[in-house]
Amino acid sequence: MDATIQAAAARLSRRLKKNGKTVTLAESCTGGLLASTMTDIAGASAWFQRSFVTYANEAKIEELGVDPEELASKGAVSAQVAIQMAQGALRRANADFAISVTGIAGPSNQGSKKPVGTVYVGIASRTWANAKRTQIGGTREENKSGFVHFALLTAMDCWNKAFDRMVEEREQMAHEAEVARLKLEMEAKRATELENQQEGHEAKAASWQDEAWESNGDEEEIGLEVEWVDSEE
């Protein structure tokens, strides 16, 4: 196996192991070569779950649940089928991610309108799925190796972007939470200010009442100031 392919597989395995994630595979044109490449790495059982080799269309339908109408209209070598293969493998396996490979290794395209060397790689998780296409020119063996390399690179690229999206979503959620917290603080502060203002008004009114009725110790002896008239005069 080419050293660059081995390096790509090792890089992917480290990423999976570091994050405690597992992967499952669904292969067509590579016939298990991707699974072989990944399980050549010692300790693969920690992150490699299982693999499906669905070479025939019937196998794609039976094993992975690929839509027969999609196969008929789009062809086995298409983005739609690549995504459905990955999603089907994910449903069948207790894994976090799935990689699928479907293409035309050659030497002929067997009547397909797509040229030899065309490949689609599907990547799926529980929350997202994507597919990428490329074309590799070479012998059947070279194409299969190239497909494996492209699948590994695509997986890393998609998962890096997914990680970036996850970070952005977390940052957005944190920002929204901070905005909500500040809003609640402002509302609470405003409510306290209004309450204090109300208490101030009530205190002022009570003070006026005290002044109106307070005698300040100088009691008025009204009876002494009244001239009483004798009714008998």
Regions found by a protein language model. Give the residues of each.
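Short alpha-helical segments enriched in small residues
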Residues: 1-233
